[in-house]
């Protein structure tokens, strides 16, 4: 019997809430911050929701 596994890359990058919303943190916050404005750095810190169009493909890879 085959066991279905989560995609490791998807499970590291996305979190599914109890309401089945998929959340992620945007990239570009880890380095080279001197040239970025304060408002841009604040915006990059926020957790964002995945668009409905992309959610189906992520849910297939993220089973639980």
Curated annotation (Swiss-Prot):
InterPro entries: Ribosomal_bL35, Ribosomal_bL35-like, Ribosomal_bL35_CS, Ribosomal_bL35_sf
Any GO MF annotation of the entry: structural constituent of ribosome
Principal cellular location given in the protein's record: plastid
GO biological process: translation
Keyword terms: Chloroplast, Plastid, Ribonucleoprotein, Ribosomal protein
Localization per Swiss-Prot or TrEMBL: Plastid, Chloroplast
Pfam families hit by this protein: Ribosomal_L35p
Domain of life: Eukaryota
Cellular component, GO annotation: chloroplast; ribonucleoprotein complex; ribosome
Family, per entry: Belongs to the bacterial ribosomal protein bL35 family.
Name listed for the protein in its UniProt record: Large ribosomal subunit protein bL35c
Species whose genome carries this gene: Cyanidium caldarium (Red alga)
Protein's gene: rpl35
